[in-house]
Design a protein with these regions (language model features):
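Helix-start/capping segments and mature chain N-termini
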Residues: 1-78, 95, 100-276
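Ordered, amphipathic secondary-structure segments that act as subunit-interaction surfaces
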Residues: 81-94
Length: 276
């Protein structure tokens, strides 16, 4: 995390923002967030991130005044400049700062906004994948939403790490592949590229959307065992870009030459063009 952050439109020292201890955010994790890649000092796919943030906020009935929401992009650009970021990442979190009615009689309704930035994530060059024993409920109210309730994702990843893996495939209640613990999934069979359908309950990732717009890719519903016959498997997110998996359980993969791995140069070029 960088030295300066933004909390409710004000610059603060990173890590010192204060929230209401009885708020729905603190007690129940009521909030949504998005993580944005920064290339050449510019946030990448900002429009997509803001659209998802607005959509996810509405889904959990978190209502921020339009004027404040519309100022988020400008605030982020100011923070990027202040922290002198060339390449990095940012996280925008909107959370319910209203005290929970279960614990407080009266409270002013409000939505807090925290924006932080950091250097690019460091990812192992030797990524190992397994299958998580923890399933996703595709019919749950938070399915497909990037909410602050990320404990299940973290626990699934911790379980995989305890077994010596870096990430894990998570299936839904029907046994269909949805995603990795903290990323979307893509895989190659021959020259065909695949990814789980949104109907599985997977997150509608912005990087996922960008890939679907720029590559010939089929959205499918398959069981986890289907990926065992894949030629290559990739995980994607704004924080890590595109990373090829080197191993799925005991099976090892050779390096792929698929142009999907050129996503970051493509992203950087598109970011520069949008800034001109």
């Amino acid at each position: 995390m960088h030295k300066v952050a933004l909390f409710n439109g004000k610059f603060i020292e990173g890590g010192v923002a204060k929230i209401e201890v009885l708020s729905a955010a603190a007690l129940f994790g009521r909030g949504v967030f998005t993580t944005i890649a920064i290339f050449d000092g510019k946030p990448f796919l900002m429009d997509k991130h803001l659209r998802r943030l607005r959509r996810n906020s509405a889904a959990i009935k978190l209502s921020q005044p339009e004027k404040e929401f519309n100022s988020i992009e400008q605030q982020l650009n100011e923070l990027i400049h202040l922290n002198s970021i060339v390449n990095g990442r940012a996280r925008i979190t909107l959370f319910d700062g209203t005290a929970s009615r279960m614990w407080a009689n009266k409270s002013e309704e409000r939505v807090d906004c925290l924006i932080v930035t950091a250097d690019p994530r460091q990812v192992s060059a030797d990524l190992k994948l397994t299958v998580s024993p923890y399933s996703i409920n595709s019919r749950a109210p938070l399915a497909g939403i990037k909410s602050c309730n990320y404990l299940e994702n973290l626990m699934a990843k911790d379980e995989a790490k305890a077994r010596g893996f870096d990430e894990a495939i998570r299936a839904n209640e029907r046994g269909e592949v949805t995603s990795a613990c903290m990323a979307n999934l893509f895989w190659l069979k021959g020259d065909r590229l695949f990814t789980p359908s949104l109907a599985t309950g997977c997150l509608a990732g912005t990087t996922r959307e960008f890939i679907l717009e720029n590559f010939d890719c089929r959205e499918v519903t398959v069981a986890a065992d289907e990926l065992r016959s894949a030629d290559s498997i990739f995980i994607t997110s704004a924080g890590i870009g595109v990373r090829q998996l080197n191993k799925f359980d005991e099976r090892e993969f050779t390096d792929s030459a698929h142009p999907l791995l050129d996503l970051l140069p493509i992203a950087d070029k598109k970011t520069r063009m949008s800034a001109e």
